[in-house]
């Protein structure tokens, strides 16, 4: 597929390259959040469902009316963070054996909640402030792609230059040794899954901004 795509003369067209950058932003945000979980030797299987659920929360607010686009975005990110925090607490406080179990269950719960909050209907006509992140460009480059690059830079600095970033690596390397060295591994893990939820929410916002719709059934 890669060879045939590159061989196509239209592959290098400006519109196609910009389209690819816009489409990859969704997965890029999910991957940024997932990175933290993977470093701690865990995984978050609920990121896709979390993104859809956060988008559907925005859809429910848009359908109800009376909410600004900025408020929708803030609530969306708060909901994503809350879901991620619950994932972290299930792992650290209830001491479930592996995040595979808790996040897999959370994924199914979120799919159901996405259908409930939208009443299984597609929602459209979002404010321009919401669609700006997914559709607009700055000097020809998609806003969502620029935000992804900035997020990558910030994440690199955070993981390599801060004590919390190093604690995340230590937790993934040897959880018990890290705990015995005085690092609160429970808080570190909860932070990682909370950030995964925030990144999932950003992915949901970008998805709504690019398509202009949200659909709990998809």
Task: State the predicted function of each range.
Residues 99-162, 188-191, 207-218:
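Transmembrane helix-bundle core of multi-pass membrane transporters
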Residues 66-107:
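Alpha-helical transmembrane segments within multi-pass membrane transporters and channels
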Residues 2-9, 14-65, 90-95:
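Single transmembrane alpha-helix segments in multi-pass membrane proteins
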Residues 7-19, 158-160, 165, 193-218:
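Inter-helical junctions in multi-pass inner-membrane proteins, predominant
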Residues 1-12, 40, 115-119, 156-163:
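Structural signal for alpha-helical transmembrane segments and their membrane-water exit/capping regions
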Residues 20, 27-28, 49-53, 70-78, ...:
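Hydrophobic alpha-helical transmembrane segments
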Residues 32, 36, 49, 73, ...:
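Hydrophobic positions within alpha-helical transmembrane segments of bacterial inner-membrane proteins
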